Amino acid sequence: MRAVASAAADRTHYLMRPDLGRRLAGDADTRLAAYAGSGHDVAFVIADGLSARAVEMHARPLLEASLPRLAGWRIAPLVVVRQGRVAIGDEIARALCADIAVVLFGERPGLSAPDSMGAYLTFKPTPQTTDAARNCISNIRPEGLAYADAAVTLTHLLRAMRARQISGVQLKDDRLLLDGE
């Protein structure tokens, strides 16, 4: 696991300057590039986002349910980002030479879900990538989308991205999802 920070120095900057949460601080990209090797199929990134509690509670169980389903994939070292926004995964994937970024992100707490986590998937991310190029799996938590079901959706989308070379609005999850599938 590699720990990095965004360019947002603190929570105030993170909230007032969203652009800083999308960029890596200092030489983090250079430090991550040391782990690029010959490239990776996917890079998993954990960003505290708007609810650190969400990723603290749900990132590990989702990864434990997902990673066994990705046997044979070249998976980059896990990166944990302090004060990170979704788009920071673009810079991280580029530094690690990863084809796909998966950002596990603490979603904005709502009245009924203070601990909801989202997974944002992007094929061939670049600094110019827009949100339209991302797929999102939201409300990952026991009271929402269960880890096993989220892992099925996540790995299905990853395989589809790799096969079709697209993500975001061009790629729909059009399969029927059954409990525990």
For the regions a language model picked out, list residue spans one by one.
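C-terminal functional extensions of proteins
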Residues: E107-E181
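Glycine-rich phosphate/diphosphate-binding loop of Rossmann-like nucleotide-binding domains
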Residues: A52-W73
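Glycine-rich phosphate-binding loop
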Residues: D90-M117
